[in-house]
């Protein structure tokens, strides 16, 4: 399941995460956002606890999207160690997202390929 995060609790939730964090920025009525959420739900089902996936409604939260200068939706941002690292592009399928994460987080892709955690 993908949890909602707000401007108010963003720094606390992302900063305390022991795993990389993906944040989807979305708004109601955005068809691309709904499609991305479905792909992220599939991704969460495969990677388990090796990645935290959150979503933020930009119509209710302005601070974080403004700091990141988000101008189009959906947008997907990667955080590690509580810090913004980069945006993830090519927001089509779960496999495309995993491909972009592969060089950064080898255990994530190993989980998706084998169906069980690496190690």
PLM region spans:
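Aromatic-flanked redox-active Cys/Sec active sites in thiol-based oxidoreductases
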Residues: 25-30
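Structural micro-motif
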Residues: 19, 62, 68-77
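A short beta-strand-turn-helix
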Residues: 3-20
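Non-catalytic, surface beta->alpha helical segment in thiol-disulfide oxidoreductase systems
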Residues: 72, 77-112
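Typically the conserved alpha-helix immediately C-terminal to a functionally engaged Cys/Sec
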Residues: 32-47
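Hydrophobic beta-strand anchors of alpha/beta hydrolase catalytic cores
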Residues: 22-23, 53, 76
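Conserved acidic residues
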Residues: 57-59
């Amino acid at each position: 399941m993908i949890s909602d995060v707000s401007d108010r609790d963003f720094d606390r939730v992302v900063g305390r995460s022991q795993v990389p964090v993906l944040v989807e920025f979305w708004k109601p009525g955005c068809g691309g956002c709904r499609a991305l959420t479905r792909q992220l739900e599939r991704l969460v089902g495969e990677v388990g606890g090796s990645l935290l996936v959150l979503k933020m409604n930009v119509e209710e939260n302005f601070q974080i999207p403004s700091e990141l200068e988000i101008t189009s939706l959906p947008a997907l941002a990667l955080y590690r160690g509580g810090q913004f690292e980069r945006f993830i592009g090519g927001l089509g399928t779960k496999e495309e997202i995993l491909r972009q994460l592969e060089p950064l987080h080898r255990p994530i892709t190993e989980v998706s390929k084998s169906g069980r955690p690496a190690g």
